[in-house]
Amino acid sequence: MENRIFIRMVGAMLLLCVVFTAFHGSERRIRTTIDDAFKYAVEKDFQNRKLYLTRNAASNIRYGVRDYALSPSFDRKIVNYSLRTPTGIHTYQFKDSISEETAKRFLTQHLLEKVHRLNPNHVKKLFLERLEEKEIDAQVGVLCLRDTVRHWSDADSVVPKNVYSTPRQVLDITGKIKVQAWADYSVGTV
């Protein structure tokens, strides 16, 4: 009799371990999908704002912004990037060498912020669309930090407790513009 009870207990513990492992793996996959969906939304917003430069007349765009944002980048590593402005030449120095394409993306984000700012509501909409494509049902919010000023999607600064927050992404060359999202998904999604 004791042998049967022991076997049932071991079986139950093994079943619990399998269920826990499957649940934990599913949650990790969902969080990875949420991170990827947010990166996609930020990238798509960047491309949409960059497209804004090509559609507007040069008189609407500040000095040199269009030239820098739309010029090609080369496949090489750089340690600094120079920008000509009406007040002179500004040089941005990097700690390590980075690809010119990455530096150009950071610079373009910085310049776009002056003519067509990132809108957390638009990023949130793109984020939700991507999550729906991936069949993840969640409440989400987006935070954009400009220096120390916080801009929330839907002007809502209340984040529910126990939600998943994506890693904060630095967008511009100065490191002053950052975005982050949170997602509150149900256990049924896992």
What residues fall within each predicted segment?
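Signal peptide cleavage region of secreted peptide precursors
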Residues: 23-26
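The feature marks either
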Residues: 18, 28-186
